[in-house]
């Protein structure tokens, strides 16, 4: 409630614009978030904005595409900070980034970060301004999956310093954990992609992968 006066909440009956001042707040220390709760009467009395999205697109899909882009940016920042720390931190007379074990962890981080970056770009690709649901599923699933691995490796390399309040790494990794769950975790979006393959596609798995990941037609259209 320090920034927003109202929040748009999606529930079983649709969407409601709910004032933050009327909510019961519960601080969530792990992610530096606040959990907001409203009564059923408050939800029924709140205005329901008329949000019309094209092509059957729902708010969760739109939100997931945006959060995937946020995750990709945060993942890159965590990786760059960790790489810089590994080059600066001296142990046994040389930077810890010279040790093979640290180099291996950095290499794995890099794979996750750049895979998430490409997936997030795929989630934003399309012929219009609104994302395609299956591409968003790929983007959010891959970025959420990377969040766990990158946060774990970053804190392993930083050691205890990464958890301190004075060091900004924990601000970024808290966001990774929070955004991983926002609009559906990787498990949810894996299910969306699987359902598209089983129920909504007549060709082979490879055909679906090609049609989903090939953005050249969108660029030339």
Put a short name on every predicted segment.
Residues 61-221:
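Alpha-helical interface subdomain recognition
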Residues 1-80, 206-212, 216-221:
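FAD-binding core of flavoproteins
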């Amino acid at each position: 409630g320090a920034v927003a006066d109202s929040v748009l909440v999606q529930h079983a009956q649709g969407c409601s614009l709910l004032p933050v001042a009327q909510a019961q707040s519960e601080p969530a220390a792990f992610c530096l978030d606040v959990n907001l709760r409203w009564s059923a009467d408050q939800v029924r009395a709140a205005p329901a904005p008329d949000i019309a999205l094209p092509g059957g697109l729902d708010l969760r899909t739109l939100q997931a595409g945006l959060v995937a882009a946020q995750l990709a940016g945060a993942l890159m920042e965590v990786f760059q900070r960790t790489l810089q720390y590994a080059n600066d931190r001296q142990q046994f007379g040389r930077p810890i980034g010279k040790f093979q074990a640290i180099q291996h962890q950095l290499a794995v981080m890099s794979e996750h970060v750049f895979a998430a970056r490409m997936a997030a770009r795929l989630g934003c690709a399309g012929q219009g301004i609104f994302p395609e649901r299956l591409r968003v599923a790929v983007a959010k699933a891959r970025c959420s999956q990377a969040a766990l691995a990158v946060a774990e490796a970053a804190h392993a390399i930083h050691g205890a310093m990464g958890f301190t309040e004075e060091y900004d790494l924990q601000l970024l990794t808290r966001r990774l954990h929070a955004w991983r769950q926002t609009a559906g975790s990787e498990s949810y979006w894996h299910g969306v992609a699987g359902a598209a393959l089983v129920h909504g596609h007549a060709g082979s798995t490879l055909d679906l992968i090609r049609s989903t990941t090939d953005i050249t037609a969108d660029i030339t259209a």
